[in-house]
């Protein structure tokens, strides 16, 4: 597997309103624990669309892994131009910080937001151009990742597309593991 998409809940869907909230530490550690074995097995690219929450934290994790000398690259494929246009200043800064980590950046539709079909185009393009996906998504708590999940699940059923969901139980396991380490 050479490329994997990482997506999941937006931070506010998890009740997290600051990029550096305590909960983010656990989310990022969980992602790191899932990405490192894949990188060690040959993963070269992590693909995100630059949305708030799980995706930007994943971008930060890739940056941290690069600093630890892992050979991994980050691509940000935004669904449309000026995705962060309506975000508050703190979130715009967060997105621009993650953008500096990216090895590749492009817009799937080279125009501003027009309608929700641009999100469907994003999902389809990313799934069609990756070998798999890791979602921080719990089937018991629907949210915005459901649309990507449904499409990725179809890809998995039709091919050898890799699909891994990190649910709230997996996150809780990391919280407990990290707290026992103290």
From Swiss-Prot:
Source species, domain of life: Bacteria
Record InterPro entries: YspA
UniProt-listed NCBIfam families: PRK13660.1
PANTHER family: UPF0398 PROTEIN SPR0331, UPF0398 PROTEIN YPSA
Similarity annotation: Belongs to the UPF0398 family.
Protein name: UPF0398 protein lwe1908
Organism expressing this protein natively: Listeria welshimeri serovar 6b (strain ATCC 35897 / DSM 20650 / CCUG 15529 / CIP 8149 / NCTC 11857 / SLCC 5334 / V8)
Lineage: Bacteria, Bacillati, Bacillota, Bacilli, Bacillales
